[in-house]
Amino acid sequence: MAEGDTILRAKERLSDALVGQSIGVSAPNPRGRAAGIERLDGRTLAGIDAHGKHLLFDFGDLVLHSHLGMSGGWHVYGRGERWRRPRTSAWAVLSGERSEAVEFGGPTLRVLPASRVAIDPQLARLGPDILAPEFALDAVVGGLRAAPGRTLGDALLDQTL
């Protein structure tokens, strides 16, 4: 399973390869989870945000939300470079000028309006990202103190803190 530090590195690789470019989009796997992804084709990728194990690709008024789960992964290749996995196993391909990013597997790959990100049930329940530059330790400590009977193990597993 991809952990937060792995997602942060993926965000950096993906950002270096694609941010600021007009992106071609395809979903080669006919059973892929990329419903609505064609709406992103030709749009400029403004940025990518990592929040815990989630990646959010900012296309202006639309966001591509990716969660890799236990077995998913984003691969970055040079345009025309041979992929390590078959094309038909790709859920999504984001093609820039010189690079392309390919998502294989993962339980979540969806497009949502940017206006819904803050209220989306899957994303709104997430607590602060400890790897984010703006991480506020005081807020987490306050959350822990608000439930003094909770065990440390339960607190660490609670993503809303």
Q: PLM features: residue spans?
A:
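Phosphate/anion-contacting hairpin/loop surfaces
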Residues: 64-161
